[in-house]
């Protein structure tokens, strides 16, 4: 896709907006991973940058960030609301507390 050779510590507005566009598409009851989003953008090595972009979502953007989990379905540590929001969308969890990606993974 695009070539983001710039310093990874400085997220470009373009990169963030592309991440936000993908997150907007995740339907209720589904989740995706940081790595899946990075791969969709053509930059599979940028999964951590996807996470950084989601940590700085502008107020009022109303993105369903709660639908993004790590590669094994683990939720964001310390963000209790994420579990509540996913429960409300009937997302199921395994015994270890991770989202059941076999049932709910969106690509």
Regions found by a protein language model. Name each.
Residues 2-107:
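Nucleic acid-binding interface residues in structured DNA/RNA-binding domains
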């Amino acid at each position: 896709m695009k070539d983001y050779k710039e310093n990874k510590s400085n997220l470009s507005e373009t990169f963030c907006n592309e991440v936000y566009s993908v997150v907007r598409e995740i339907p209720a009851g589904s989740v995706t991973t940081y790595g899946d989003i990075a791969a969709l953008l053509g930059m599979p090595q940028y999964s951590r940058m996807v996470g950084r972009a989601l940590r700085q979502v502008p107020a009022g953007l109303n993105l369903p960030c709660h639908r993004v989990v790590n590669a094994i379905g683990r939720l964001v540590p310390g963000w209790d609301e994420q579990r509540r929001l996913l429960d409300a969308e009937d997302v199921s969890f395994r015994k270890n507390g991770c989202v059941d990606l076999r049932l709910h993974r969106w690509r």
